[in-house]
From Swiss-Prot:
UniProt-annotated stretches for the region Disordered: 1-101, 137-168, 205-245, 285-580
Full protein name: Reticulon-1
Residue stretches of biased makeup (Basic and acidic residues): 497-511
Highest taxon of the lineage: Eukaryota
Any GO CC annotation of this UniProt entry: dendrite
Transmembrane regions listed in the UniProt entry: 603-623, 705-725
GO BP annotation list: brain development; endoplasmic reticulum tubular network formation; negative regulation of amyloid-beta formation; neuron differentiation
Gene3D superfamilies: 1.20.5.2480
Major location (coarse): endoplasmic reticulum
Ranges for domain Reticulon: 589-776
Keywords: Endoplasmic reticulum, Golgi apparatus, Membrane, Phosphoprotein, Transmembrane, Transmembrane helix
Location of this chain's protein in the cell: Endoplasmic reticulum membrane; Golgi apparatus membrane
PANTHER family, alphabetized: RETICULON-1, RETICULON-LIKE PROTEIN
């Protein structure tokens, strides 16, 4: 690495808005740097090439043409050999040397937007290719005489600031013609892959460059596989020990070996020694409509951040080619091994202005063709990525407000990028540029024509989406005729595409719109869609009562299932039906007691009577055994009978008790918990009441309970417990029916009995002092 400079080697302030600095430090060399346009004192042992006079002449020429011209973008190469290199440059394009003497980085910088730092060291120059070498122009006369160059690229007068993650921050100059100053046309494809396009204007560069009279005595040889680029100052002697900087730029593997150079201050020793190759950025500007040149904006202390503003007169169409950047803050994805090289991607992705204008004019027709052939999901998902690549970077920058002004001022750039065919076909990779067109550029379409075409395309897409939604809603509601009247008529091809897409979308949206009531209707939607069309006018009255019947069908089925269950008793139910709770359902018990189903009530009543009479004659164990044998004899006999019948009739009806075998009779945990809680409540209430009566909490209640027990002694002497239970069962099945039939007479007699009982109780309470006091 080079030794750090002396403290006296400080950079002086800029001489003007277009002045640039040139400084490169060799090994052990300390050279003072002077601004351009000033006359430095020649050092000992070095001839004065007389550049001071020419610099003063260029300075006077610049002062005369200051307000009418503006400095172009210049290529700047700086050395990082100085220890105090500033890291203020946000984006640098660097190539590290092998021997570790110093790292050279090159960037395109506009001095209007970025004021130079006090410790920045770099040099500027306009490259011209002469016999395979690019030489820095040292005089205005040499700069004004360009060598053999390639065909001119159609220029554009861009007013916005374009910045990217790849290290390029530029403000294009006010020029109507952009020239690539490269000499050999045969080496065009080789040079375009990894060389900068110097954007300048030959007739206006004489006042831009005023070089320092004392340049570095070092020759930087960029040794590539194809070309050798050397920077040789005119009038300065050759150094004895040149510091070559080698870069492994191979055109076939340029994208695979390209890496993004980190900031200069973050470079480690290994990174400085290893060569780092960075893919350059190619920026091509195409002029659509020329406009009047604006005056040069002077950089004053009050207006240091003034940049070019977008003009309403121009509508630029800009295509920026960026190298892949794998840094976290970059939106450009890194390149992979499968991507094509720079030359291949440029040949495939470059389009001319004729093709661009033709694609814009055919945008409306392409929109309908794409509607007929819907794109796969992968291409539709890649569209936001393409738009993200073509858009400006999202990293924070002090010039973001200037970059946003270009977007807000010229909306045609965003509209052109939104073209579905141009966004996917014209941007296959990260490197895209307009091809060279010989002769004058063709007359492009006016901004109003472009805007009208794009607007019609967007409106056609919106109308097609509206009609698709209308067709989807027509199957579930009656709002489709209204929407079709509001929407404009479409072409037959678009309508056919809509009909094809309607079936696919209906399968996805029908379950959510129609509900679970029609599980299989949306599957037959394409075939059943044309059928209700002709039947809709005469069948409006018939369709309206059917649609509300759909949610009512489950309710009717449930009610119909409950009524036969109550009338016909327990029958074969499905496996998903709730388990029958015999004698536990209140409504079912009421139906049994009131003989609403005579057959079912008779079976239950006879079973109880048989059980009770059996218990009166036999013990409980004998009754259980006899009942089990009777049930088994009945079921076995029926099973054999059905089997013989099926064998004779040669039928296969299956098991005769199959429905009962599949019937779910298990009690769930919730049901058991429910009845257990109910039983617990009654048991606890009974225990509390008995405790209160036996402990004479209330004397009257305890006396009543005593009288009841005295009467039960007489009942027990007359009847057995089973007889009482039998009488209770008979009364339970007979009294409700008798009460319903003779309710009026029974109520009358019950009223008389209640009155007589109340009178007797009142007399008893009058004779008992405690009872009277309690009644008061």
């Amino acid at each position: 690495m080079a030794a750090p400079g002396d403290p006296q080697d400080e950079l002086l302030p800029l001489a003007g808005p277009g002045s640039q600095w040139l400084r490169h430090r060799g090994e052990g060399e300390n050279e003072a740097v002077t601004p351009k346009g000033a006359t430095p004192a020649p050092q000992a042992g070095e001839p004065s090439p007389g550049l001071g006079a020419r610099a003063r002449e260029a300075a006077s020429r610049e002062a005369g043409s200051g307000p009418a011209r503006q400095s172009p973008v210049a290529m700047e190469t700086a050395s990082t050999g100085v220890a105090g290199v500033s890291s203020a440059m946000d984006h640098t394009f660097s190539t590290t040397s092998k021997d570790g003497e110093g790292s050279c980085y090159t960037s395109l910088i506009s001095d209007i937007c970025y004021p130079p730092q006090e410790d920045s060291t770099y040099f500027t120059g306009i490259l011209q290719k002469e016999n395979g070498h690019v030489t820095i122009s040292e005089s205005p006369e040499e700069l004004g005489t360009p060598g053999p160059s390639l065909p001119d690229v159609p220029g554009i007068e861009s007013r916005g600031l374009f910045s990217s993650d790849s290290g390029i921050e530029m403000t294009p100059a006010e020029s109507t013609e952009v020239n690539k100053i490269l000499a050999d046309p045969l080496d065009q494809m080789k040079a375009e892959a990894y060389k900068y396009i110097d954007i300048t204007r030959p007739e206006e560069v004489k006042h831009q460059e005023q070089h320092h009279p004392e340049l570095e005595d070092k020759d930087l040889d960029f040794k590539n596989k194809d070309t050798d680029i050397s920077i040789k100052p005119e009038g300065v002697r050759e150094p004895d020990k040149p510091a070559p900087v080698e870069g492994k730029i191979i055109k076939d593997h340029l994208l695979e070996e390209s890496t993004f150079a980190p900031y200069i201050d973050d470079l480690s020793e290994e990174q400085r020694r290893a060569p780092q190759i960075t893919t350059p950025v190619k920026i091509t500007l195409t002029e659509i409509e020329p406009s009047v040149e604006t005056t040069t904006q002077e950089k004053t202390p009050e207006k240091q951040d003034i940049c070019l503003k977008p003009s309403p007169d121009t509508v630029p169409t800009v295509t920026v080619s960026e190298p892949e950047d794998d840094s976290p803050g970059s939106i450009t994805p890194p390149s992979s091994g499968t991507e094509p090289s720079a030359a291949e991607s440029q040949g495939k992705g470059s389009i001319s202005e004729d093709e661009l204008i033709t694609a814009i004019k055919e945008a409306k027709g392409l929109s309908y063709e794409t509607a007929e052939n819907p794109r796969p999901v992968g291409q539709l998902a890649d569209r936001p990525e393409v738009k993200a690549r073509s858009g400006p970077p999202t990293i924070p920058s002090p010039l973001d407000h200037e970059a946003s002004s270009a977007e807000s001022g010229d909306s045609e750039i965003e509209l052109v990028s939104e073209d579905p065919m141009a966004a996917e076909d014209a941007l296959p990779s990260g490197y895209v540029s307009f091809g060279h067109v010989g002769g004058p550029p063709p007359s492009p379409a006016s901004p109003s024509i472009q805007y009208s075409i794009l607007r019609e395309e967007r409106e056609a897409e919106l109308d097609s989406e509206l009609i698709i939604e209308s067709c989807d809603a027509s199957s579930a509601s009656e709002e489709s005729p209204k929407r079709e009247q509001d929407s404009p008529p479409m072409k037959p091809s678009a309508l056919d595409a809509i009909r094809e897409e309607t079936g696919v979308r209906a399968e996805e949206r029908a379950p959510s719109r129609r509900g679970l009531a029609e599980p299989g209707s949306f599957l037959d939607y394409p075939s059943t869609e044309p059928q209700p069309g002709p039947e809709l006018p005469p069948g409006d009255g018939a369709l309206e009562p059917e649609t509300p019947m759909l949610p009512r069908k489950p309710e009717e089925d449930s009610s119909s299932n409950q009524s036969p269950a109550a009338t016909k008793g327990p029958g074969p139910l499905g496996p998903g039906a709730p388990p029958p709770l015999l004698f536990l359902n209140k409504q079912k018990a009421i139906d049994l007691l009131y003989w609403r189903d005579i057959k079912q009530t008779g079976i239950v009543f006879g079973s109880f009577l048989l059980l009770l009479f059996s218990l009166t004659q036999f013990s409980v164990v004998s009754v259980v055994a006899y009942l089990a044998l009777a049930a088994l004899s009945a079921t076995i006999s029926f099973r054999i009978y059905k089997s013989v019948l099926q064998a004779v009739q040669k039928t296969d009806e299956g098991h005769p008790f199959k429905a009962y075998l599949e019937l779910e009779i298990t009690l769930s945990q919730e049901q058991i918990q429910k009845y257990t809680d109910c039983l617990q409540f009654y048991v606890n209430s009974t225990l509390k009441e008995l405790r209160r009566l036996f402990l004479v909490q209330d004397l009257v209640d305890s006396l009543k309970f005593a009288v009841l027990m005295w009467l039960l002694t007489y009942v027990g002497a007359l009847f057995n417990g089973l007889t009482l239970l039998l009488m209770a069962v008979v009364s339970m099945f007979t009294l409700p029916v008798v009460y319903v039939k003779h309710q009026a007479q029974i109520d009358q007699y019950l009223g008389l009995v209640r009155t007589h009982i109340n009178a007797v109780v009142a007399k008893i309470q009058a004779k008992i002092p405690g009872a009277k006091r309690h009644a008061e």
